[in-house]
């Protein structure tokens, strides 16, 4: 089983959006038996909170299924159990390197690196641009799917 873990600052905007977008792509490809997807936070700030309402609205508008959830923090077990750990920006990467003691198993990447681009998924919590975040996330998730399934 390929285990993909998306990580962002608080686990209420970008990483849950990526989780639900990726789950939708995996389901539409009929690959649920091969790929599991989850998300978590690199910080404690939003632990216990559900996906941010504007993200839920956008997912609903796009026809992407989502569930009620609670933000959770990245753990050492996440590192051991995940095949790919995918952050959204350089801050996430720094946090993940710190939390994994330098990523010795080379599991950490940034989402848009999968598309060949060297840029971040901007945090819509600050930009209020959920549509652009969605487009970047969808593009990155599609590239991941192509990259992990031969």
What are these regions (language model features)?
Residues 84, 90-150:
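Phosphate-binding/catalytic loops
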Residues 1-81, 146-150:
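Conserved active-site segments centered on acidic
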């Amino acid at each position: 089983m390929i285990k993909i873990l998306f990580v962002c600052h608080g686990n209420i905007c970008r990483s849950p959006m990526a989780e639900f977008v990726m789950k939708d792509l995996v389901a539409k490809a009929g690959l649920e038996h091969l790929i599991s997807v989850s998300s978590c936070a690199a910080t404690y700030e939003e632990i216990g909170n559900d996906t941010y309402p504007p993200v839920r609205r956008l997912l609903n508008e796009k026809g992407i299924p989502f569930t009620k959830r609670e933000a959770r923090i990245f753990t050492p077990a996440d590192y051991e159990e995940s095949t790919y750990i995918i952050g959204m920006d350089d801050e996430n990467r720094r946090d993940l390197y710190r939390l994994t003691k330098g990523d010795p198993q080379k599991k950490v990447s940034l989402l848009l690196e999968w598309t060949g681009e060297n840029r971040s998924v901007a945090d819509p919590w600050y930009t209020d641009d959920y549509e652009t975040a969605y487009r970047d996330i969808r593009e990155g998730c599609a590239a991941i799917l192509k990259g992990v399934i031969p």
